[in-house]
Amino acid sequence: MGYFSLIIVITIISFLNAEGIDSQELPIGLTDFEKNNINLLLEMGRETSPPNQPVRNIAEFERMSGVLVRYPLGVSLDIIRELAEDVIVYCLVSSAQQNTALNAFNNNDINMGNIQFIVGPTDSYWTRDYGPWWVVDGNKEVGIVDFTYNRPRLNDNNAPFKTSEYLDVPYYSVDMIHCGGNYMTDGRGIGASSHLVYEENDLESENIDSLMNIYYGIDTYHVVEDPNDTYIDH
């Protein structure tokens, strides 16, 4: 897989009147059930060997060739149409809803030549939070590095692995609870998150910093108070 043959996980914004949005979607925050069963996160973790060193975590602003969304959508079909004019739209969709997604895209004049379905169940459309992060390993090979999604949503948590299987790229996972919305990197070894990453893991901060270095190539990890002071802490 070439260096630029990557996916950027776009931030999903919920528009109240956007076409194709399912009103029954799980919220970005925890539901009451999830709050009462947060211990399920401990059963979702997986760990692999880290990528060959040195590792470089690819920044979201770098050149990409595709985007990752999920159906039912969290963005309008108009946005999907615009995206599909220029890049491949990889769409996570359950087998039960694949035909519905196909019909919705066809009926809205979307370029189906740039639509690829990754089939499997998901729990929500917050792909920016649970989707894959990309690295280049010491052999200059592009792969996915995953964490345990900080919501007890097993199907969402499995999305990065399903993506790696579909694209046939290496998959690595660190047994650490995290959230894509609470992480960003400059692509040159510097990363940043809110203090939530320290609070959600039963690990010393030094251990978390070390895992970020080994799996993501982050040499300088800025963990700060949530500057927005929001309930989701990122």
Task: Kindly label every feature range from the protein language model.
Residues 19-234:
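The feature marks the mature, well-folded catalytic cores of soluble enzymes
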Residues 1-23:
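Bacterial Sec-dependent N-terminal signal peptides
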